């Protein structure tokens, strides 16, 4: 697996158009994490974004949540639809992603034409001939019995684990689920042990069902973290309110160490040098399914709060918001999805580290992907031409300075690369990393998490909240 060394910009990316500047942007108390007052959910299914922010894919930000005035009627309709599909946790996370427009211009689970284009081209073509990036299938699997029960129906109701209606899927299309090909093309291997494939594909049904989604209510988790779950439309409102003239996004699924912070703060410095006046960081931790040895979201968010409280990142120029997508660990294929979703959230700059969305090979002692392929693929990916992918160099722990710094190959003996495995081992033993690797209060959260494992679960993983409407 890739080490926890970070990556940092070293060259000038293509410069995009400036964003609207709001001279009345609010200020934030130092040392506190930014929690914004959210606007009302946008009620139209297709919101034409006319602000100075980068336009979402397809020019419209999809909002698939039913208008509040129509929810009672639609809930009644959902109860009367005879065909029902029970959603699992990952299915619900994809409903959340789709409902808020992260996957715009998708209007629901993929039909076969969208699925095939995604699988073979990592993109699909719109009616006007333009191409948008889409590298991971967003699909809903059903089994033979469910397909039989649906019959000739044109719509189905999607329900949660206890039968509560979540959404209606309209104008449906059912087609074969080519599991082996899907796994091979998404991960580049069919080896056993791929976390997402084991969770959501290999045991799933032999059919896929696509259609247009009508989500009955905004998806909530009621886990104390919903205040951090800003939709793309809400994030865009916040960036305008802050007067951002550039938005740079950082995706992560791990605790923030000082190498990450160096990456983010130096990126802002370089954007200021380029002439931007108020670049804003979107720190966008992944909030959906993750593999068993990743730190759960609730603990990561506690750690992120400490990072801002300790001033490692500036809360006045940082927006912390949860990205609701499941994690596929599909390397260069998946990192395109991560980048595309941030366009829809308003980001025009995207930072990548080493081995983005990567993991160790499930059956061999090596990394599954080349650590540099993610950044290279992003610079060439169809449909991502509008997004500025920042070139970078590696950062590691500089023993001579006692802090994370940019790696200097001329004195490589002075640098220490602390892998994720090494970091977890230290935390489990309640040992401290080298001074300057992570802020002490953030490290304590990590130690407390590993200390809590046996007490809270006995199976090595703290349970996570499940979405509900």
Swiss-Prot record:
Reaction catalyzed: sulfate + ATP + H(+) = adenosine 5'-phosphosulfate + diphosphate
The subcellular location is:
Plastid, Chloroplast stroma
CDD domains on file: ATPS (cd00517)
Q: What is its main location?
A: plastid
Give the range of the organelle targeting sequence: 1-51
Regarding tissue, the record states: Expressed in roots and leaves.
GO terms (BP aspect): hydrogen sulfide biosynthetic process; sulfate assimilation
Identify one Gene Ontology CC term for this UniProt entry: chloroplast
Top EC category: transferase
Look up the EC number in the record and give it.
Answer: 2.7.7.4
- Give the matching Pfam families: ATP-sulfurylase, PUA_2
Q: Which UniProt keywords apply?
A: ATP-binding, Chloroplast, Nucleotide-binding, Nucleotidyltransferase, Plastid, Transferase, Transit peptide
User: Which GO molecular function annotation, any one, does this entry have?
Assistant: ATP binding
Looking up InterPro entries in the UniProt record yields:
ATP-Sase_PUA-like_dom, PUA-like_sf, Rossmann-like_a/b/a_fold, Sulfurylase_cat_dom, Sulphate_adenylyltransferase
Q: In which pathway does it act?
A: Sulfur metabolism; hydrogen sulfide biosynthesis; sulfite from sulfate: step 1/3
Q: What family is this protein classified in?
A: Belongs to the sulfate adenylyltransferase family.
Q: How does it assemble?
A: Homotetramer.
Main function: Sulfate adenylyltransferase. Catalyzes the first step of the sulfate assimilation pathway.
This chain's protein is named ATP sulfurylase 4, chloroplastic
Source organism per entry reads: Arabidopsis thaliana
The gene coding this protein: APS4
């Amino acid at each position: 697996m890739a080490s926890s060394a970070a990556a940092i910009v070293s060259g000038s990316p293509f410069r995009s158009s400036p964003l609207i500047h709001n001279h009345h942007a609010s200020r934030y108390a130092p040392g506190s994490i930014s929690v914004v007052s959210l606007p009302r959910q946008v009620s139209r299914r297709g919101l034409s974004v006319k602000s100075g922010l980068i336009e979402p894919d397809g020019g419209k930000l999809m909002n698939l949540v039913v208008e509040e005035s129509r929810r009672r009627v639609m809930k009644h309709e959902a109860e009367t639809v005879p065909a029902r599909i029970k959603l699992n946790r990952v299915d619900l996370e994809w409903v959340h992603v789709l409902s808020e427009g992260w996957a715009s211009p998708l209007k629901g689970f993929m039909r076969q034409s969208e699925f095939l284009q995604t699988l073979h081209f990592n993109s699909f073509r719109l009616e006007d001939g333009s191409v948008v990036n889409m590298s991971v299938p967003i699909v809903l699997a059903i089994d033979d019995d469910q397909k039989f029960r649906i019959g000739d129906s044109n719509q189905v109701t999607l329900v949660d684990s206890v039968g509560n209606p979540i959404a209606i899927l309209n104008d449906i299309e059912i087609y074969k689920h080519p599991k082996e090909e899907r796994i091979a093309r998404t991960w580049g291997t069919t080896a056993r042990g791929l976390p997402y494939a084991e969770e959501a594909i290999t045991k799933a049904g032999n059919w896929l069902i696509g259609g247009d989604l009508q989500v009955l209510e905004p998806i909530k988790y009621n886990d104390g973290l919903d205040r951090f779950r800003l939709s793309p439309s809400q994030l865009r409102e916040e960036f305008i309110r802050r007067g951002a003239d550039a938005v740079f996004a950082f995706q992560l699924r791990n605790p923030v160490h000082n190498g990450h912070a160096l990456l983010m703060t130096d990126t802002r410095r370089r954007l200021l040098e380029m002439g931007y006046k108020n670049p804003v960081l979107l720190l966008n931790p992944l909030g959906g399914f993750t593999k068993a040895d990743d730190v759960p979201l609730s603990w990561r968010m506690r750690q992120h709060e400490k990072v801002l409280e300790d001033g490692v990142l500036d809360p006045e120029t940082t927006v912390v918001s949860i990205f609701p997508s499941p994690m596929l660990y599909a390397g260069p294929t998946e990192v395109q999805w991560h980048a595309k979703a941030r366009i829809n959230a308003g980001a025009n700059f995207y930072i990548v580290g080493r081995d983005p969305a990567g993991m160790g090979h499930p059956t061999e002692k090596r990394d599954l992907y080349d650590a540099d392929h993610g950044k290279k693929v992003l610079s060439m990916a169809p449909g991502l031409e509008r997004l500025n992918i920042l070139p970078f160099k590696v950062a590691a722990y500089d023993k001579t300075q006692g802090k994370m710094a940019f790696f200097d190959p001329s004195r490589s003996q002075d640098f220490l690369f602390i892998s994720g495995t090494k970091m977890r081992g230290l935390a489990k033993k309640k040992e401290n990393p080298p001074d300057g690797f992570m802020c002490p209060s953030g490290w304590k959260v990590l130690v407390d998490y590993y200390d809590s494992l046996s007490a809270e679960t006995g199976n090595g993983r703290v349970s996570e909240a499940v979405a509900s409407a």
